[in-house]
Amino acid sequence: MASSTHPEMPELSGSYENKYLCLTICGYRKAGMTEEDYHNHMVHISAPMTKHLMVKYGIRRWTQIHNQAATRALMAELFDPQMANVADFDCFSQVVFQNVEDYKRMKQDPWYQEHLVGDHENFADTKRTLVTIGWIEEFVRDGEAVDGFKS
């Protein structure tokens, strides 16, 4: 039964056996932080602290896509009527896992709580962060046409 604080979960459509979920975090850097400092913190401080914990909880892949002013400027070469709105996020972080429970258990880990929750406040504008989750459907991998995500 659904409540106002916990709505009823809708049924997942299609077959999701042997599929992976991708949590996408669209993040902004903390006010006053340069792109270089943000990138440095994400790659050289946050990632080393996080990646082994993710492996411990069955995370399959974690990537960061850094969306700096220089790379956003490349969009001028790709603009067309269908690709005209450029996202202004500083980073897209994508976490791939098979079961949402794995990610939830990782976030409940005492080490995560002690070290990573507070670290996010050192570099991220967490009030502006946007998140979404969806199934991965893969069609090209390493320059080859494929029919699905490799598990």
Swiss-Prot record:
Molecular function terms, GO-annotated: lyase activity; oxidoreductase activity
Span of the signal peptide: none
EC number: 4.1.1.-
Entry-linked Pfam families: EthD (PF07110)
Catalyzed reaction equations: atrochrysone carboxylate + H(+) = atrochrysone + CO2
Domain EthD: 31-126
The keyword Lyase belongs to this UniProt entry's keyword annotation: yes
Keyword check for Cytoplasm: no
Top EC class, one word: lyase
Keywords from the UniProt entry: Lyase
SUPFAM superfamilies (UniProt xref): Dimeric alpha+beta barrel
Pathways involved: Secondary metabolite biosynthesis
Record-stated family: Belongs to the tpcK family.
Purpose of the protein: Decarboxylase; part of the gene cluster that mediates the biosynthesis of the tetrahydroxanthone dimer neosartorin, which exhibits antibacterial activity. The two different monomeric units appear to be synthesized by the same set of enzymes, among which the Baeyer-Villiger monooxygenase nsrF is the key enzyme for the divergence of the biosynthetic routes. The pathway begins with the synthesis of atrochrysone thioester by the polyketide synthase nsrB. The atrochrysone carboxyl ACP thioesterase nsrC then breaks the thioester bond and releases the atrochrysone carboxylic acid from AacuL.
Protein name listed in UniProt: Decarboxylase nsrE
Source organism of the structure: Aspergillus novofumigatus (strain IBT 16806)
